[in-house]
Amino acid sequence: MKCQSIITTACLVGTAFAQAKLKIMPLGDSITEITCWRAKLWDLLKANGVTDNIEFVGSQTNNPQNCQASDANWDKHHEGHSGFLAINIANTLLEGWLASAQPDVVMFMLGTNDVAQGRSLTDIMAAYTRMVDLMRASNPNMKIIVDSVIPLPMNNAPIEALNAAIPPWAAEQNTTESPVYFNDVYPYPSTALRDGVHPNDAGDVIIAGALDPLLTWVIRSSTAAGNSTSS
């Protein structure tokens, strides 16, 4: 009986390991929460044959735009929160979200609300750095994808300054153990906005299409290295 118990336990452990998936957190504000690029991205990832190896994670599963993917079972988990600032996420919220979801990969677009509320570029970049520190404290091997921020026609100069600052910042933050990747969603015309802030369908296509090659590569390289990297 003891032998049978040991064999059963070993089988259960082996099955759990085999089924482990790379955990990817889509992090952001309303541009992550109430738009459809995540559904479109999932379809692109499925076409690339990698969705069996991943799961999106986060405390949210809402779908206010009733976004539809070709895959009816697309993973709706995310950490997008309308109206939230990068500064507030970094200072008070992200640590708990990371502890709950335990992602291996975080991809984020943040800063629109900070700019809209007059926060300085220095403060926004400090929040970015704080977020990276928290991600690495959660998982020393965290893979981090930072998007450029889509246009804000009502006040675009600070967005342009933020987008110019992200690539050199990402290069400074990058490490072998925990790489930081800059993902440029431009060219992104203002006609790809539905209300001057959020992407319309064309904008969702742009964001998903920009993320797809990089995220697919991250997924394949991470799973080839031994499946998920979280403890």
Please tell me what each predicted stretch does.
Residues 23-26, 31-126, 155-160, 164:
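Conserved SGNH/GDSL esterase-like catalytic core that processes O-acyl groups on lipids
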Residues 49-60, 142, 146-148, 182-183, ...:
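Surface-exposed patches in mature extracellular/periplasmic domains of secreted proteins
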Residues 13-20, 225-231:
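Fungal extracellular Ser/Thr-rich, low-complexity intrinsically disordered regions
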Residues 32, 36, 42, 46-50, ...:
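Sec-exported extracytoplasmic/periplasmic mature domains
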Residues 103, 140-141:
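Proline-centered flexible-loop/turn and helix-kink motifs
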Residues 1-19:
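Fungal secretory targeting signals
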